[in-house]
Amino acid sequence: MIGDAMSEPTFATLVSRWYERSARDLPWRKPGIGAWAILVSEVMLQQTPVVRVVPAWEAWLARWPEPRALAEDTPAEAIRMWGRLGYPRRAVRLRECAVAIVERHGGVVPDRLDHLLALPGVGTYTARAVAAFAYGQRHPVVDTNVRRVVSRAIAGEPDAGPTTRPADLVATEELLPIEPAAAALASAAFMELGAVVCTARAPRCAICPVESSCAWRASGQAAPTGPTRRPQRYAGTDRQVRGLLLAVLRESTGPVPHRRLDQVWHDDVQRARALAGLVTDGLVEPVGEESFRLAGDGPPSPSPLPHLPHPPHHQR
């Protein structure tokens, strides 16, 4: 897979040197940042732009600088602190992860890959990222950006194509230096290259550290053929309604009456569906039959099910 003009140490070395000169100055990359801070950053960066994550990450770590601090707080406070980062289920899972770290590992983020994978909400990518970036281990860390870099520079293809996790991991691992610390640096460098230079639609090939040996450039740089990503519609969706409901609940210091939530959105059926989804996802819980609150924001409620409005007769 790797041609004579681009052996694995040459590729990794070139990209790593570029990274050390040109990488973005992000707070979770600073020397001395611990595994918990890196884990939090990786969870927040899933589906959320860096510019929005930085202030949220700093505020989160200021409040909960270690897993035990978060584990001792409530799910409701985690949801409040998550604010408008989006996909707030991540906040609940991050707290569950903190609880597991305290119970299973004495409050220290584990360094073994299998132990990381066993934590709630931690998947293959996040586990490998923490093992590499926090503990300097040799693991291929593969996201969309890395897949695109490998596809273009090594295979000469403009698009990475469908995800094939085992093959992607193997292809990326072949590029890593043998020495663990150098491999961890290369993993971060590959990711950064795909994020800021080898981008999906407007690659900056002129400043790429491997431009001269890139298989895609050598083959004539065929245009990407994959589907163009369209921005997901937000206005009028259940996601918007969920966000509006959560905003009211986050700002409340106690249970919120159902009638107050009824004012959030005009469509009774959609509002009821969104509220039921928040309950199912463990973000919101009923208090009695006519009020709701953020999960864990008070003593257990005797009522296990929310009281949801019936749809209008013409919509049944």
Tell where the protein language model's regions lie, with residue ranges.
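Catalytic cores of DNA base-excision repair glycosylases
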Residues: 14, 18-242, 248-259, 264-269
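Short beta-strand-to-coil "C-cap" segments at the C-terminal boundary of structured domains/repeats
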Residues: 98, 294-299
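Surface loops and adjacent helix of pleckstrin homology
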Residues: 219, 289, 297
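Short amphipathic alpha-helical interaction segments
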Residues: 265-280
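A short, conserved structural fragment
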Residues: 279-292
